[in-house]
């Protein structure tokens, strides 16, 4: 018989840098997960993606065991990396902070395709372009 899922915890953690300190420790402690076990496994799985923020969905079972799925980094993080900026614009409609090419947007859309509910790459590109617009990044 399959184990019953007791709780689902969603976090966004920098790749390879999960530590028992807040915010990871308290969130996992409340769910009853072995914090050190999770941090070691997460860091090992995401070591090759250093510098990116990785969303993770942790399923906690009745017997306190857990499994987790890592997702692709948020579009905003990938756009900031592509545009080589620290943060988006405070006033996206007035001040533009950077530009990205449509090729870069397509690359990000293809990477994010698994996590987006888009029918094709074109729709995914429109979603990524919308995120860029809301950050004050111009898509050329």
Swiss-Prot record:
This is Large ribosomal subunit protein uL11. One of its GO terms (cellular component) is cytosolic large ribosomal subunit. Pfam families: Ribosomal_L11, Ribosomal_L11_N. One of its GO terms (biological process) is translation. PANTHER family: 60S RIBOSOMAL PROTEIN L12, LARGE RIBOSOMAL SUBUNIT PROTEIN UL11M. InterPro entries: Ribosomal_uL11, Ribosomal_uL11_bac-typ, Ribosomal_uL11_C, Ribosomal_uL11_C_sf, Ribosomal_uL11_CS, Ribosomal_uL11_N, Ribosomal_uL11_N_sf. GO terms for molecular function: large ribosomal subunit rRNA binding; structural constituent of ribosome. HAMAP family: Ribosomal_uL11. Forms part of the ribosomal stalk which helps the ribosome interact with GTP-bound translation factors. It comes from the Bacteria. The keyword Ribosomal protein applies. The lineage of its organism: Bacteria, Bacillati, Bacillota, Bacilli, Lactobacillales. Belongs to the universal ribosomal protein uL11 family. Part of the ribosomal stalk of the 50S ribosomal subunit. Interacts with L10 and the large rRNA to form the base of the stalk. L10 forms an elongated spine to which L12 dimers bind in a sequential fashion forming a multimeric L10(L12)X complex. Keywords: Methylation, Ribonucleoprotein, Ribosomal protein, RNA-binding, rRNA-binding. It comes from Enterococcus faecalis (strain ATCC 700802 / V583).
């Amino acid at each position: 018989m399959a184990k019953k899922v007791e709780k689902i915890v969603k976090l966004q953690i920098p790749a390879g840098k999960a530590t028992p300190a807040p915010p990871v420790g308290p969130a996992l402690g409340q769910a009853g997960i072995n914090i050190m076990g999770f941090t070691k496994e997460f860091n090992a799985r995401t070591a090759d993606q250093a510098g990116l923020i990785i969303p993770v969905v942790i399923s906690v079972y009745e017997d306190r065991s857990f499994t987790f799925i890592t997702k692709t980094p948020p579009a905003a993080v990938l756009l900031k990396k592509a545009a080589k900026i620290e943060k988006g614009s405070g006033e996206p409609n007035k001040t533009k902070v950077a530009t990205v090419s449509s090729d870069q947007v397509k690359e990000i859309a293809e990477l994010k395709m698994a996590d987006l509910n888009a029918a094709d790459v074109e729709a995914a590109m429109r979603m990524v372009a919308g995120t860029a617009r809301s950050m004050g990044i111009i898509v050329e």
